[in-house]
Each structure stands twice: as structure tokens, then as C-alpha cells.
Amino acid sequence: VVGSGVAGLSASMSLSRQGYNCILVEKAGSLGGHAAGYTCKAINGKCQKCGACLVDDLLARFGDFPEIQVFLETRIDRITRKKKGFTASLNGKGGLKDISCGAIVLATGFKPFDPNEKPNLCFSSIPNMITAVELEAMLRDKELPYRPSDGRQPETIAFVQCVGSRDPKRGHPYCSQVCCGYALRMAGRIRDLAPKTKITFFFMDIQTFGRSFPQRWASLQQDFIWINEIPGDYFVSDGDRVGVSVEVEDEIVDLSFDMMVLSVGMTPTDDQLTYQQMLDLSMSSEGFMLPDEDRGVFVVGSASGPMSIEKSITDAAGSATRVIAYMEGAR
């Protein structure tokens, strides 16, 4: 199993539970992937079902599976197909090591879109413009957001949706599915802890999430300011505020905020191409890996496309059934 995010952990435990020997390879120095850095978004003590706690739960339960071999800070240099199964050459802090396996589960996850790929955002030159990933870390560490320029708590915050998603020019025509959910939950968390904070959303449209969303939408419209447009120009305004030019009621106006959060989408990882070439895998229309399950290669979680934490866990657990079917048939 390659990758120890929620999908990799879920797949490993599901397979181990059925008596299969699992080897978990992770290039980072710890387990959990991106989701291990996410924060609880409960409002007034009520769970918002963001999935962040599911990661902690998986990591806690992973301790019950000491039989799973874990290689941290390890990369795979080469994968060779054999008559039955594969040989993978591992390169890690313990040196070089070849391992044999009957099937490969790629749970390599995703890469958050890099705003520097969109020059009009001026991301590197606007100090109080951050990504939603950075906001997650802020809320997990300090509970409340703060401006990177001076550490002050912002009184006004703008969220810009669909950054790096629904963007055919950048090769990302798809919706990342999770951005609206995480942005609205974090905005709600901030308002719960700092009720006077004014929050504005720049959006194309809103991706619904959760069964209760239609009922909640009315209150969300009242809680935040909604501007149905994505700004084209971004600049530093007075007091290190983030300025934007936007059309409001047929007139171009400049608005400014203490801080701006870019709701970045999910893109394929940098090492995806390496695994595609090693295993002769095809690519989906969205640019993510396609599995080759008839030949023992399975792709799970967000390695196969944008996916929430909860869906990644269930997808990986479900794929374990197919891995077992393949292994039984290959014997």
C-alpha cells in the first residue's frame, strides 16, 4: 500500500483484518497524510461532519495492527512485474530494500493547487492572502485565524472559491467537490468563536454537501456576504489589506479585506507520473490515475480523483474486497 493518508490507512487495516500481510510505504515522516493537519470545525460544540476527527480515529485504531509493516520516509524507486505479483525497490532512511507483493494499492492522495500557478492572484506578493490549507493549520494550532503580516485577528475575511478547480485553461475543468464544504465549515467555526467577524464569499455556485444542506442554506445566506463572481484583479491595499476589483451591479468597484482565503482545489500529486510509467497505467479525463485491477494494481481515495475524507475511507475499505478477490484468483 503506497501512501498513509486516510485511504492508505483504511485499505491496510481492511486487508490486515482479513489475514493479509500488508506493507505500508509512506514518503513523509509520519502517518495520516494531508488530513492529519485538518482541524475540527464543530460549531457551538455540534459536529459539522467535516471528517477531521476520522483521521485521529484511524490513527488510534492503526495501533491495533502491529503486523502491518510500515516504512516511513521511504520512496519506491522501481516496481517490476513478476509472473505472480511484483517486486518493489524501496529507498528509505534504512537504505535500499526489495520487497515482494501480490498486489499494489496506490493511495498516493492529492496535491493542493498551488496559487502561484495563477499569476493574477499575486499570491507571493500579498502577505495576508493564504490558502485554505494554511487556514486549517491556523485553526488547529491557534483556534482563531491571524494575519501573517502582524499576527492580528482579522475583522473581515474573504473566501475565494474554485481556485484551481473548474479551470479548463489550467487543465483542471473538474469541481474538486470538497472546497465549498471545508470553506463554509471553517467560516462557520470562525463566526462561532469570533461572532463579529464579517465574512464574504466570492463564488461561481455552491456545491451542496450533507443531507441537511438545503435546510442550512437559508441561514448560511444570512450569516455571510455573497458575491456571485470571482475577482480578476488582486492587490495589496492600505494596512496590508487584500484588495480586489470586482463587478457589482454593472459597476467595477474595489473592495478590501483584512485577510483573504483561497479555497484551493485538489490536483494530481507530483509523483503520479512516476507510478503511471512504472505500472503502465492510464489517466482519467480529470488527470488522475486509473487502476489496472485485472493486473493487480488498485487506485484508491483521492489518488483516483477529488474525494472527501469520509468517501476516501469507504472507497479504500471497499477496494480491499476487490484486492482480496484478485489475490484469491491469482493463487
Task: Name every feature range the model reports, one short phrase each.
Residues 1-331:
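Residues forming the flavin
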